[in-house]
Regions:
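Alpha/beta hydrolase fold serine-hydrolase catalytic domain that processes acyl esters and thioesters
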Residues: 2-20, 33-36, 54-84, 90, ...
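N-terminal, charged amphipathic alpha-helical interaction modules
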Residues: 42-46, 50-54
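Short Pro/Gly-enriched beta-strand edge/turn motifs at strand-loop
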Residues: 89-101
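Gly/Ala-rich beta-loop-alpha elbow adjacent to hydrolase catalytic centers
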Residues: 192-196, 200, 275
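Short glycine-enriched nucleophile-adjacent loop
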Residues: 201-205
Length: 465
């Protein structure tokens, strides 16, 4: 047994010998955490999908920028993964591009995505046809307070800005990779870790909703009352009815362009659900999405009871570790597989701890008692108060942890001797419910972001309860 780095280093089978699996998906999802350099084509700059060979990322002068978002240990492991993938005969031919990154404090958004082209990897075209395979990867939450805030915003709002951006991104990739009429378009897989998994599911459901809208238009024009089935390229979807998806639209301000961040890319469509697309073109979107991967990704505030969700659900492969907390938040009813991990507690959320044997995840007997307790407790809190109160508490938490002036939990941990008193002082000015939640966060942080602390003094935590 080993982790995904060990897997890539030692498993030299081609995709013809061992088809694409959830382990391969986690490999690409982990690579999406890397902050790609300027050499990588930006999103939407070309009419077709623009990529470079993954080996083009192996430039030492770029590494300080590429691996600067998380702890030194995590960054080092991701560099090991990148080098292993670049050297691996299984992934030889892998390309990456269509990179976009946006960190927007005003909109409380942390979003990044990239597209991997596996068409030149040995065995892929034999499995997926001459068009090959694209894997759209959405980055999960990094260690920033901004990313943490958007995650918690999901408790009272759907969609959050990153979910909307994910739908627009996926729509554009599907549009621009369709090729000429009669040509062979690549199959598409979508996935991500943590929040990235949630965005993968949401974006895919939005594409299915577009298909249903288009087919309803065709049915109305032809006088048919029964909508046809939406099927995946290589995995059949469920039969759908004429029930339509109605996901809340984004705030009016969400219609603005999306930037790459430091590279100022502004090419996401302003509204992918209303741009003019002929029905004959629109009804291909969900059919080209053959699988959707959510690696310990949270669900939605309420289950998306819709034909579009049902059309996608059979293609979703959700995996969670034994001590999953994040992946069990806002449980949406999607089946999940429980995976062995060699970390302790909430640290199992890190995909690098998941155990792999013979190219597949090692199955665990079920969720741990701690995970079930934590999940039920947090979900009970979310369901126990109305969305307005949830928003108030979450906003207060964000203000409190932002008060010391640091961008990430890592920086807070590094400067804890000055940051902690500021946090405690700000917390004491809030109501009892907020103080209790802050105490809970502080109690959990030694196992996560506050690694530099031997422990948060229990007296400090008790004083906030």
């Amino acid at each position: 047994m080993g982790n995904i780095v060990d897997y890539v280093r030692t498993d030299f089978r081609t995709f013809a010998e061992h088809p694409f699996s959830a382990v391969d998906s986690l490999v690409l999802s982990e690579l999406s955490y890397i902050r790609l350099p300027l050499v990588v084509p930006v999103f939407g700059a070309a009419r077709s999908i623009d990529t470079i060979a993954l080996t083009g990322l192996l430039r030492a002068e770029d590494f300080p920028m590429m691996f600067a978002a998380d702890s030194q240990q995590v960054n080092s492991t991701r560099l090991d993964l990148l080098v292993a993938v670049a050297e691996s005969p299984r992934f030889r031919g892998l390309r990456v591009g269509e990179y976009i990154q946006r960190d927007d404090v005003d909109r409380e958004q942390q979003f990044a995505a990239m597209t991997f082209d596996l068409g030149d990897c040995t065995g892929i075209r034999g499995l997926f046809g001459p068009g090959g395979l694209l894997y759209v990867a959405f980055r999960g939450t990094d260690g920033t307070l901004l990313g943490w805030k958007e995650d918690f915003n999901m408790a009272f709002r759907c969609p959050v800005p990153s979910q909307e951006s994910a739908a627009k991104y996926l729509s554009s990739i599907l549009d621009r990779s369709a090729g000429v009429p009669g040509g062979d378009a690549p199959a598409v897989m979508v996935g991500g870790h943590s929040k990235g998994g949630n965005m993968a599911v949401y974006a895919s459901v939005r594409m299915a909703a577009r298909d249903l809208d288009a087919m309803q238009w065709l049915a109305d024009e032809s006088g048919e009352s029964q909508l046809p089935m939406i099927e995946a390229t290589s995995m059949a979807g469920r039969r759908t009815s004429d029930k339509q998806l109605r996901i809340g639209s984004a705030d009016p301000g969400d219609a603005g362009n999306i930037s790459r961040g430091v590279q100022d890319n502004q090419n996401l469509p302003t509204d992918s659900t209303t741009q003019h697309v002929q029905p004959a073109q629109r009804n291909r979107y969900a059919a080209r999405i053959c699988r959707v991967f959510s690696h310990d990704g949270p669900g939605f505030p309420k289950r998306l009871e819709s034909a579009a969700f049902d059309a996608v659900a059979s293609r979703v492969d959700k995996t969670v570790p034994q001590s999953s907390v994040v992946g069990m938040l806002m449980d949406d009813g999607l089946p999940h597989r429980v995976i062995e991990a060699d970390a302790v507690g909430i640290m199992q959320h890190l995909g690098m701890s998941w155990q792999v044997q013979d190219g597949e995840f090692v199955a665990a007997p079920g969720l741990s008692a701690t995970a079930m307790f934590a999940g039920s407790t947090v979900n009970a809190w979310m369901l126990g108060i109305d969305p307005a109160d949830r928003r108030k508490v979450i906003d207060e938490l964000y203000v409190i942890f932002s008060t010391p002036g640091y961008r990430s939990f890592g920086e807070l941990a590094e400067h804890w001797t000055t940051a902690l008193p500021v946090i405690i002082d700000a917390t004491r000015k809030t109501d009892r419910e907020t103080r209790r939640l802050v105490a809970g966060v502080l109690a959990a942080l030694p196992a996560t972001a506050w690694r530099n602390l031997p422990q948060v003094p229990q007296l400090v935590i008790d004083s906030l309860r």
